[in-house]
């Protein structure tokens, strides 16, 4: 074999090994608030998406916040950090990581509160896929399912009330009125709910732990059913419990979108601003719909909302 040809082959092998080493060094740490099904489902999707891009399973490590902090103390060298859930994000942000951070599985208000409480400006190496849907999309769903509705009812809690002006703008820009009540304490929940239901055609649920929780949702839904005021919820579990519809992103949708942001971080590209889910699903409670004289199809509603979002 000519010497020049041998040198060329050796150079090719060297480049190949260098590329392999670069991929193997592309470590991704996924920090889960806890090792429960919801967080693990999204972590599995992210892992599968990154493996399709060429990373191997050993390049991706799952941690709880405590485990990640121990790894950092031992000289952790992740190229990108993914946080799943509010507690994981808070713990990681508190350590001021140098690596790019992709946060997921927390609503926008929770994300912004944690950044605000950290005392830092939003770092340029930080982005997120929010858990909740944008207000405009939710109000558009209200108009699709209830074209004759005039007023949208909303219950605010201590955490969600910071979004009041944003939702009000989304509602009013679509030609609807808004009736809202701020629940300052648990004792005032049902008085606030009654005042909202008395003046509204639909109840738009906005996540807030003081308003919507496992201990309150059954009675809230019972009150809406008796008043014949449907709820547009943010979780499919609420549809099973008696809400008319819910709009939400699935673990697969959130995981795939987060993985796309991780890829940007691994490539050294600038991360985009925090974003809402691009994709979503809608669930319909057929029994509640029939009781209200409505004929709703989840797939048709989803397609119409997606089409509306793509229009200029």
Task: Identify the meaning behind each predicted range.
Residues 1-4:
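N-terminal secretory signal peptides that target proteins for export/translocation
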Residues 8-18:
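Bacterial N-terminal signal peptides
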Residues 23-312:
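Short hydrophobic alpha-helices and adjacent helix-cap/hinge residues
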